[in-house]
Regions:
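C-terminal partner/receptor-binding element of secreted or periplasmic proteins
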Residues: 153-187
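Sec-dependent signal peptide cleavage junction
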Residues: 1-2, 187
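Aromatic-patch recognition
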Residues: 2-157
Length: 187
């Protein structure tokens, strides 16, 4: 455990050379001239001890592997710092920010976006899957039927209600996963 003051954070910066959500600098005092650099590979978590109105319990960032499939390896992961969003008995959701490129007319511009992901508590690798990857073949080996269950979650009359709730609740994936586990237990 290291206590200190954050001098340069890990958040996604506009610099194209710095890895997003990966490294940060911590100083022993606010005036310290020699901060120490840490990376997501070296830390387990970061906990803010100063509480704010929006986060009365402080904010916890964890260093975890994020699923990032590629052409050569569909199970590739990157170690990054992700913010704990909400935890349940069976899974935990996280968020982090990334830079993406959007086309506006004839101009490409960089946009900062928030990505949400889920870590299943029974996953031995502790991998965080971005929401958009949960309904792919990546989770099928460990959670048979989850891919199909996820694709039908927003279908039908109940699905329309769930879709409306999902826009207001960014941790909707926890409810979907609990429903999937309940359906598996009934089989």
């Amino acid at each position: 455990k290291v206590d200190g003051y954050l001098q340069r954070s890990w958040h996604a910066e506009s610099s194209v050379l710095k890895k997003e959500n990966y490294s940060f600098k911590l100083a022993k005092t606010p005036d310290d001239k020699e901060p120490v650099k840490y990376t997501a590979d070296e830390v387990e978590s970061i906990e803010y001890v100063e509480k704010t109105e929006a986060h009365p319990d402080g904010i916890r960032w964890e260093a975890l592997d994020i699923a990032s499939p590629g052409l050569k390896d569909r199970y590739r992961t990157f170690r990054r710092l992700v913010c704990l969003n909400k935890a349940s008995q069976n899974a935990t959701t996280y968020w982090w920010k990334i830079w993406t490129t959007e086309r506006v007319g004839n101009i490409d511009r960089r946009v900062l976006k928030t990505v949400y992901g889920i870590r299943f508590h029974d996953d031995p690798d502790r991998t965080v899957y971005p929401y958009m990857l949960v309904n792919t073949m990546l989770v099928e080996k460990q959670h048979p039927g989850l891919q199909k269950f996820c694709k039908t979650w927003f279908k039908g009359s109940e699905g329309k209600v769930r879709k409306k709730e999902a826009k207001e609740n960014d941790a909707w994936m926890l409810d979907m996963y609990d429903a999937y586990l309940a359906a598996q237990a009934d089989k």
